[in-house]
Amino acid sequence: MPQKLYIETFGCQMNEYDSAKMRDLLEVSDSFELARSPEEADVLLLNTCSIRDKAQEKVFSQLGRWRPIKLRRPEVVIGVGGCVASQEGEALQKRAPYVDIVFGPQTLHRLPSMLEQVRCERRPVVDVSFPAIEKFDALPEPRADGPKAFVSVMEGCGKYCTFCVVPYTRGEEISRPVDDVIAEIVALAEQGVREVNLLGQNVNAYRGVLADGGMADLALLMHYVAAVDGIDRIRFTTSHPVEFSDALIEAFRDIPQLVSHLHLPVQSGSDRILRLMKRGHTRAEYMAKVAKLREIRPDLSLSSDFIVGFPGETDEDFEDTMALIEQLGFDQSFSFIFSARPGTPAAAMADDVPPETKRARLARLQAKIADNAAKIGASMVGSIQSVLVEGTSRKNFNELSGRTENNRVVNFAGHPRLIGQFVDVVITESLPNSLRGRLIGVAHESDFISPDSTAQIA
């Protein structure tokens, strides 16, 4: 009988990608199948994130919930991976001695052998090393899970922003060879994937080796991706403004598959705070890049990351951020109150912004983003949008759900056979977190099919 695997994932899209690879590795090597709950699992894996406040506490809280399972069934193996595991290493296992495996983002490919070692030797295994590109060489064949997929093209970051742990937990920048990336995307396209999201902690810094020994940047890589049969949409994340080159801007002009949506973290609109964060760019430089992009793609939607209450942030600094949001019209964001990450330079700075001030600033910022989003959503009502149908609606299984090019969720009535297809939907209503629409046609192999004909689609 197959063993059961349960994976809990905290954090970013890269962690989601890594968790999917853990699942694939163990399904291939040890014939595991996914458990519906931790209680029925033989192996419990926690893939952790160290970006947000109290990341360690969240990890140990989750492990505490799993501890009774281990006490009842000592043969259950508990593993902790991801960035907190990389930070804590052996200290994590000492604090939670019932944890059997501690592994970093760059050693997840060793999970099958670590699992075998734990079971044979009956002692914990800790491996948080950084074995460069080896991780990608050892991963199983890609497996599609719906019409869109994440594809990791590089890992790590060498920017060392003062608030960020990524260089310490994911290591320096490592790019996959171009042929390896394209082979993975071809395999996914053959399984029905229509949209790929190219991932990296600093994806703009991609420098992959070509078959002839040359080097490809992200712009060139996306030209190769666009040539893959079946891939109709390309996204990429996460970007650093410093690495956003003219070649990358020109890719928005030359590659129609590249969507008119960009996540470009700025963190703050204050030059003084940007210097303290060691971001390497100014407010004006950031705005100039966005202006160039919007000359090429006037309908480009923009999302960002913001940190409020960074050490030393004054009212004036915060107002600079609010003004930037107003000027550039960000309509989506990941925004957080500053919390010091252990071992980073910002952790040594005086955290002198009162908690109540931080909370008030965050509330104002998020309200402004929500207001921008509402205005853009309202402006889309009556428009016809191309939507990639991802599945059924989370709130109504009788409806379908998909995303527009500008990353808006749209729910509408339609036949489940449309999942995985691009459809044309007229937007009828804008809601706080989604849009509602009416199906008006299906784009299928370059033909237009009316809604009455959707039963013909296999």
Swiss-Prot record:
Cofactor: how bound: Binds 2 [4Fe-4S] clusters. One cluster is coordinated with 3 cysteines and an exchangeable S-adenosyl-L-methionine.
Cofactor(s) this protein requires: [4Fe-4S] cluster
Protein location: Cytoplasm
Domain TRAM: 378-441
Gene Ontology MF term list: 4 iron, 4 sulfur cluster binding; metal ion binding; N6-isopentenyladenosine methylthiotransferase activity
Disulfide pattern: none
Chain ranges of the Radical SAM core domain: 143-375
Keyword Transmembrane helix: no
Residues that hold [4Fe-4S] cluster 2 according to the record: 157, 161, 164
Sequence ranges assigned to domain MTTase N-terminal in this UniProt record: 3-120
Entry binding sites for [4Fe-4S] cluster 1: 12, 49, 83
Cellular component aspect of the GO annotation: cytosol
Keywords of this entry: 4Fe-4S, Cytoplasm, Iron, Iron-sulfur, Metal-binding, S-adenosyl-L-methionine, Transferase, tRNA processing
Catalytic activity: N(6)-dimethylallyladenosine(37) in tRNA + (sulfur carrier)-SH + AH2 + 2 S-adenosyl-L-methionine = 2-methylsulfanyl-N(6)-dimethylallyladenosine(37) in tRNA + (sulfur carrier)-H + 5'-deoxyadenosine + L-methionine + A + S-adenosyl-L-homocysteine + 2 H(+)
Keyword Metal-binding: yes
PANTHER family found in the cross-reference section: CDK5 REGULATORY SUBUNIT-ASSOCIATED PROTEIN 1, MITOCHONDRIAL TRNA METHYLTHIOTRANSFERASE CDK5RAP1
Biological role: Catalyzes the methylthiolation of N6-(dimethylallyl)adenosine (i(6)A), leading to the formation of 2-methylthio-N6-(dimethylallyl)adenosine (ms(2)i(6)A) at position 37 in tRNAs that read codons beginning with uridine.
Stored HAMAP family: tRNA_metthiotr_MiaB
Homology family: Belongs to the methylthiotransferase family. MiaB subfamily.
Record text on subunit structure and interactions: Monomer.
Protein name: tRNA-2-methylthio-N(6)-dimethylallyladenosine synthase
